[in-house]
Amino acid sequence: MASTVAGNSFVSQQHPGNLHSANLQSQSQGFRRQNSTSSVPSTASFDPPNGSIANTGSQKHHPMSSQQSQPPASQQSFSMSQTGSQPQPSQSSFRSYSDQNVPQQPQEASPIYTAVYSNVEVYEFEVNGVAVMKRIGDSKLNATQILKVAGVEKGKRTKILEKEIQTGEHEKVQGGYGKYQGTWIKYERALEVCRQYGVEELLRPLLEYNRNPDGSVSQANLNTPTKEQAMAAQRKKMYNSGADSRNNNGGGTFFKNISQTAHSAMTAISKARFDSPGPRGRNGPTRAPSFQRQLSTQSIDDFHGGNSQASNFAENFPPQDVNMAFSAGSEPQPGGLNGTEPPRKRQRMDMTPANSFGAYANNSQMQAYADAFPGSPTEPNDSFIYTQHAAANDTLLQQQHDQQTPLQPLPYEQSVEAENKRSMLMSIFMNDGMSEQARVDTLRQIHPRDLDMPIDSQCHTALHWAATLSRMTILRRLIEAGASPFRVNTSGETPLMRACIVTNSHDNDSMPAILDILGNTMEVRDSKERTVLHHIALTSAVSGRSAASRYYLQCLLGWVVRQGAANGGQLNSQTFNGGATVSQSQNATRLDLGRFMSEMLNAQDSAGDTALNIAARIGNRSIISQLLEVCASPHIANRSGLRPTDFGIGVDSDGAMKTKGDSGGDVENGDVGGSSQKSNESSNEIVTSITHLLTETSANFQEEIKNKQKNIDSLHATLRLTTTDVNDLRRKLDEAQARVKAQQLARQKVTNLQRAEERERYRLTQLEQTTGRRDIASANGWEAESNTLLATINATTNGEPDADAKLPSSALLRARIEAVKKQTESTRQSVVALKGRSREVEGRYRHLVALATKCRDEDVDSTMEGLLKAVESEKGELEIGRVRRFLGGVEGVIG
């Protein structure tokens, strides 16, 4: 049966068989991921109508180029060194024990175990801290991992892959689980690469594993342990190897100088363990193996057992019974457990010995053993035996798993019916005067499924509002009416997370009550893989909320302690009798301090940050001290490689790592487990990386400055050429404008002459109409005739002969005289008319000159001489157009 771990595609396999736990190395190293930089993101808040809910932060986190879900702490791989390699310092959350109390032993070969990444089954083998994989289906190996084992740096490794590996047949995996990514090549090509880079001997166990002498691939070995089995056996070996040197005083745990909360937790769990019925003789059997997921569900008491229960079981029962018990795991099981599809990682389930051995409970010895020692969830468990009862309860466990899965928000409907239901839910919070019975009646009118409907734009439910505003009565009524505490908002936040973001629960001192109601959602993660601990650490960075965050964390740890003690007392008095009820299954899956410390305390979000890492960056000492007291690991790095130790958490003033000593004080651990050396190496790596980054940045800056200077010089040259062109164009423009002005002046003169000609023609026409058209030749002849006549008269007067006969007739003379008179009169009238017109124009011009010179009209004649000299002194011709425009503007004033 498969169980997908939230947030990643990793699915482990469990095969029955011998774990060879005696050959496992006793050091444990947490899985270190290569993560990108993380920042404290903004936690959006909502504003209920009857409460004050502030925003918890506004800093925006930069997006990652490729977000990958990380496995929880229960699925982190462990690192074991090959014989002869340098021992690696422990990075687990139990570092204070493993570094100080475990005696140094010769390193042994790392085991080969099975795992599933991105739905592909692989054999996994760790060498020098590098997990090397070989596919079970086609025996292909990851060339990237082989080069890592060979110690090839990342830059050279990339060039080798591009030039040597990827030129041939290969398969490049970029998506999916991070450890599975890389370049996969065939077995033969992988063998050549191993020989080329001198790692064939190191990888020989994996290369030759599950292969026949003739080189063919045999069927999958069912005795190969899974990663969880190998890690559980390794941790058991680690404890057993240091059990004799461990000090058992104080609280009876290997956690030294822990807080009162953690000490109470350990006392409660130990009491529940030792109060369970049945004798606890040293030489008698401890308890029958039960089906339990070792890594993620193992309690703290796994580190308190004595000898291996597998060996005790072999001593107390005949070999044939042992063989029968182990062979039962390979038989077809109900519920899909058959030989072709081995059972995968399942939900945790505690059973009595009778249920653990299933069909073999009829054996009298086994039955007596089961009756004498019923199962206890607080005792260590090393068995990986699958029983028919376990398969029969798969459906029940799947239902319980579904209850622990966050429910996505319902769609925000806009219908009238939905608005009415939303208004009914809102009225519960807005109407403070509503009675308790009225609230109950209102909730009864709404279907349980509609209680989870979103009531605001961020898809918060009524349960979110009640938890945020710390309305305990409404919160209880909603749960009783059927509202799901697993329904999340658009950010994947549960009501419990929302309650930890604001200070209302701190002000009302209601967090313990909220945890009693919503505590079963503590393991749920939001869309960024953050737990309640992450939200508490993030909220502590907001001004004025540090005290509330400290209070929430204290209440949370206290609640976990109480849950562990309550579960221990209840389950010790319960037996499954062939099947478990829903309530019993829920009790069995409650979160106790053991699971809290192994699964939640060091859980990493999508950016790789643990709650301690966030608190270390923020610098909240109260949160840091509480997390360190319950053994949060300061050595887990995020995607950017930053650890709490980089911020001085878990490091003394000299830079040496600190651990908890028996005396209750911090002691140096620089010589134990290579912690100080590891810290110094990490610091040197950071300094080297920063130096390289600064050098590279400076070189890039200088190169960019040179390029910019070249561009500036080119622009200056272009600017000079452009300026010259502009000056030439301006000169040409001035010349063109001068020519245009001359043309305009010439056109104006022509226009004036044409107008004057038209006026003269008009006057001539009028004159001809008045006096008649005159012939110039006849007029000249008349003058000549007059002159001749006068000469004749003068001659006659002087005694010349009579010339009367030559004179014109009197009638002609009279006509001529009359014509002369008329002409004279017409000329006189024209003169008078001209004088009148000249007088009018003269008055206008006099008034114009008076306005221009700012004097009276009578004084114009006295200043005329000076004005004439001023006008005559002007050089060049006057612009007639400007004079006409000026006179035209003045005519309106004069008129």
From Swiss-Prot:
Residues 112-219 form the HTH APSES-type domain. ANK repeats lie at residues 458-488, 607-636. It is found in: Nucleus. Residues 64-100 have a biased composition (Low complexity). Disruption phenotype: Leads to deformed and non-melanized appressoria that are unable to penetrate plant surface due to the impaired cell wall integrity. Shows abnormal hyphae as a result of altered chitin synthesis. Leads to sensitivity to H(2)O(2). Residues 1-45, 674-684 have a biased composition (Polar residues). PROSITE patterns: ANK_REP_REGION, ANK_REPEAT, HTH_APSES. GO terms for molecular function: DNA binding; DNA-binding transcription activator activity, RNA polymerase II-specific; transcription coactivator activity. Residues 143-164 bind DNA. Keywords: ANK repeat, Coiled coil, Conidiation, Nucleus, Repeat, Sporulation, Transcription, Transcription regulation, Virulence. InterPro entries: Ankyrin_rpt, Ankyrin_rpt-contain_sf, HTH_APSES_sf, KilA/APSES_HTH, SWI6-like, Tscrpt_reg_HTH_APSES-type. Gene3D superfamilies: Ankyrin repeat-containing domain, Transcription regulator HTH, APSES-type DNA-binding domain. Residues 698-759 form a coiled coil. Residues 1-107, 272-293, 323-358, 653-684 are annotated as: Disordered. GO terms for biological process: conidium formation; sporulation resulting in formation of a cellular spore. Pfam families: Ank_4 (PF13637), KilA-N (PF04383). GO terms for cellular component: MBF transcription complex; SBF transcription complex. Transcription factor that plays a role downstream of the MCK1-MKK2-MPS1 cascade. Required for hyphal morphogenesis and pathogenicity. Is an important oxidative stress response regulator and plays a positive role in the regulation of extracellular peroxidases. PANTHER family: ASPARAGINASE, CHROMO DOMAIN-CONTAINING PROTEIN. This is Transcription factor SWI6.
